[in-house]
């Protein structure tokens, strides 16, 4: 086993010296990448016939790559010797397994990287700190929060203050708008009520004149002759009356017209007397016929209308359950004795009923 270790040590020294003379890295020499690169370059020179054109031999053409024959031989022999040494170490395993451990260590040895890994610009991987020190990430987070509390606290408090201000501003604007609308409505209602109370009201018969004019128009129309009356009765499918009936009907209509003309028509322009508060109290007063209007402007209702509304609400909601229960209790027969539950037992003792 000591010979294997000395062989590996010598191979490492030769690879280090060869790296200084050729410019290749130690890991490239041990893995065989340097030999593969030199072989590829020599094959390329032979392919383009540079050796034949120059009139040089193959060994002299190898010097064009910058390497000597000894260096080329060492580049090809070192990877093979390293693999053989590792195989010998695995073959001569001891009971304790020291040779296997040495072989594994030599196999890695920092030079067992693959070609893509060597050529690519990768970042070394480090395990998570929590694997080695559980809870360190949480501790670092809280430590960072404690160290940077000033800025975060300023932003958090500023954000909450801004949200509170916006919320309060929205509420204040809504309340102010609602208050202005309610105040404007109340002022308008109060103004209309004052106008209605202090206005000068007069009785007029304008609508009555309209209906009376229509009535006079139909009254003074020419009377229908007997032929028109008979035709009207025939259209309705009724037997026409006699001449005496016609005369009686005409006399009756004339008497009714004369009786209606004898009535006095209501005069227009009669003003309603406005009375002040009794006793000089200077309180607001209004006429009885104007009271529903004034109360409606202020949002109140008259007692009569309140009774009507209560009736309508009771009809919509239906009779209450309490009244229905009372009516059921009245209809049930009255009895003093209360029914006993079937689950009750008179004798709950452990002794038997036959105690004799």
Curated annotation (Swiss-Prot):
Coiled coil: none
Example GO BP: viral penetration into host nucleus
Composition-biased stretches (Basic and acidic residues): 244-267
Transmembrane segments: 289-309
Regions of compositional bias (Basic residues) in chain numbering: 343-356
The keyword Signal belongs to this UniProt entry's keyword annotation: no
Region of interest called DNA-binding, as start-end residue ranges on this chain: 308-354
InterPro entries, alphabetized: Polyoma_coat_VP2 (IPR001070)
Polar residues bias: start-end ranges: 329-340
Motif Nuclear localization signal location, chain numbering: 320-326
Lipidated positions per record (N-myristoyl glycine): 2
Protein name in the entry: Minor capsid protein VP2
Source species: B-lymphotropic polyomavirus (LPV)
Highest classification ranks of the organism: Viruses, Monodnaviria, Shotokuvirae, Cossaviricota, Papovaviricetes
């Amino acid at each position: 086993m000591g010979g294997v270790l000395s062989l590996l040590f010598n191979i490492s020294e030769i690879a280090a010296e060869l790296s200084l003379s050729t410019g290749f890295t130690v890991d490239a020499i041990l893995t065989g990448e340097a030999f593969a690169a030199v072989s590829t370059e020599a094959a390329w020179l032979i392919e383009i016939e540079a050796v034949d054109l120059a009139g040089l031999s193959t060994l002299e053409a190898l010097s064009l790559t910058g390497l000597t024959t000894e260096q080329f031989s060492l580049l090809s022999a070192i990877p093979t010797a390293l693999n053989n040494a590792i195989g010998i170490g695995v073959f001569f395993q001891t009971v304790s397994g020291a040779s296997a451990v040495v072989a594994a260590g030599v196999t890695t040895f920092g030079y067992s990287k693959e070609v893509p890994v060597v050529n690519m610009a990768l970042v070394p991987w480090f395990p998570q700190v929590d694997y080695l020190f559980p809870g360190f990430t949480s501790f670092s987070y809280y430590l960072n929060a404690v160290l940077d509390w000033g800025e975060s606290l300023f932003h958090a408090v500023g954000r909450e203050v801004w949200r509170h201000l916006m919320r309060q501003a929205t509420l204040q604007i809504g309340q102010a708008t609602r208050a202005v609308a309610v105040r404007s409505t109340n002022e308008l209602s109060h103004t209309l009520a004052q106008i209605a109370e202090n206005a000068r009201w007069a009785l007029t018969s304008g609508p009555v004149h309209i209906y009376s004019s229509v009535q006079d128009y139909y009254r003074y129309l020419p009377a229908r002759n007997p032929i028109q009356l008979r035709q009207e009765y025939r259209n309705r499918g009724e037997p026409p009356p006699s001449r005496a009936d016609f005369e009686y009907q005409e006399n009756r209509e004339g008497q009714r017209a004369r009786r209606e003309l004898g009535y006095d028509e209501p005069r227009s322009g009669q003003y309603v007397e406005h009375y002040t508060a009794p006793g000089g109290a200077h309180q607001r007063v209004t006429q009885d016929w104007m009271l529903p209007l004034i109360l409606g402007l202020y949002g109140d209702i008259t007692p009569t209308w309140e009774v009507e509304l209560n009736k309508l609400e009771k009809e919509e909601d239906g009779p209450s359950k309490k009244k229905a229960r009372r009516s059921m209790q009245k209809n049930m027969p009255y009895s003093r004795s209360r029914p006993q539950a079937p689950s009750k037992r008179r004798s709950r003792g452990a002794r038997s009923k036959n105690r004799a």
